């Protein structure tokens, strides 16, 4: 059965000064899938995510759950759309658990309910042991995992309408936590029928966890397909200028990008 489209962008363009960052992008995202936005530095991945999330305001055509973006009140949309940015400028001496609980601000919950939900997602993202630590004293990776728990908390009460956007969520993480973060994101998509959109640089991580790959180059979509179709030596050479061969993981079966020589 075809999955319903929950987010659609049509003819999306973005320009900063004289630089055309995005050029007439048409893209749609469905419930229950993980979509990786990929491409070299400056391809437009994060800019596209910011447009789609509403972080960059635009008069262009974006729809959430079949309803025009401009028709949504921000408070209502925040119950259904959560964005994990590349970095946070939070500098106040909050405790780690208080940062996660900030995700519940859009929700009408008691303090006890907020605590229970926050603890659930802190366990999933492996930050329970940091609960009473001061946020500014944490490492970059620990902060990244805390904010992931915060965004999951934000979406806990959103019913069957969930869009989770992650902008380079593994950039500060060690190997084990990279995989745990993407495993949690995929589980969130499948178990809660959520749409998950994630900006990544690692093609092999994307191949393992994403259902679809949207590869951008110079502000345009080069390919929008499953990993098996998106990852070819020709596409990788054209987009990244890198000579690669495509293998296959011996047990999990997903495509593996390897040096051609």
UniProtKB/Swiss-Prot annotation:
Record family assignment: Belongs to the ABC transporter superfamily. Heme (hemin) importer (TC 3.A.1.14.5) family.
Keyword annotations: ATP-binding, Cell inner membrane, Cell membrane, Membrane, Nucleotide-binding, Translocase, Transport
Any Pfam family matching the protein: ABC_tran
One GO cellular component, as annotated: plasma membrane
SUPFAM superfamilies: P-loop containing nucleoside triphosphate hydrolases (SSF52540)
Gene Ontology terms, MF aspect: ATP binding; ATP hydrolysis activity
Span of domain ABC transporter: 7-243
Keyword Lyase included in the entry's annotation: no
Top-level division of the source organism's lineage: Bacteria
Membrane topology, record value: Peripheral membrane protein
Subunit composition and interactions: The complex is composed of two ATP-binding proteins (HmuV), two transmembrane proteins (HmuU) and a solute-binding protein (HmuT).
Functional description taken from the UniProt entry: Part of the ABC transporter complex HmuTUV involved in hemin import. Responsible for energy coupling to the transport system.
Species: Vibrio vulnificus (strain CMCP6)
Protein name: Hemin import ATP-binding protein HmuV
Enzyme Commission (EC) number: 7.6.2.-
Subcellular location: Cell inner membrane
Family matches, as InterPro entries: AAA+_ATPase, ABC_transporter-like_ATP-bd, P-loop_NTPase
Membrane-spanning intervals of the chain: none
Gene (UniProt): hmuV
Binding positions (ATP): 39-46
First-level EC class: translocase
Main location: membrane
């Amino acid at each position: 059965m075809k999955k319903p489209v929950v987010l659609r962008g049509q003819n999306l363009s973005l320009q900063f000064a004289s630089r055309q960052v995005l050029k007439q992008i048409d893209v749609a995202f469905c419930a229950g899938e993980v979509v990786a936005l990929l491409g070299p530095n400056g391809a437009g991945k994060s800019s596209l995510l910011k447009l789609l999330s509403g972080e960059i305001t635009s008069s262009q055509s974006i729809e959430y759950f079949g309803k025009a973006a401009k028709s949504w009140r921000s408070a209502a949309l925040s119950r259904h759309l959560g964005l994990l940015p590349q970095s946070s400028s939070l500098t106040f001496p909050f405790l780690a658990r208080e940062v996660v609980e900030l995700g519940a601000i859009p929700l009408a919950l008691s303090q006890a309910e907020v605590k229970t939900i926050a603890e659930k997602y802190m366990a999933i993202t492996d930050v329970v042991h940091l609960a009473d630590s001061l946020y500014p004293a944490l490492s970059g990776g620990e902060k990244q995992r805390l904010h992931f728990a915060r965004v999951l908390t934000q979406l806990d009460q959103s019913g069957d309408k969930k869009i989770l956007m992650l902008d380079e969520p593994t950039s500060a993480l060690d190997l084990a936590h990279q995989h745990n973060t993407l495993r949690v994101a995929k589980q969130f998509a499948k178990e809660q029928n959520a749409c998950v959109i994630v900006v990544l640089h690692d093609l092999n991580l994307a191949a393992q966890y994403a259902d679809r790959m949207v590869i951008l180059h110079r502000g345009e979509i080069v390919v929008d397909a499953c990993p098996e179709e998106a990852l070819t030596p020709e596409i990788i050479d054209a987009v990244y200028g890198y000579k690669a061969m495509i293998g296959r993981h011996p047990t999990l079966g997903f495509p593996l990008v390897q040096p051609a020589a």
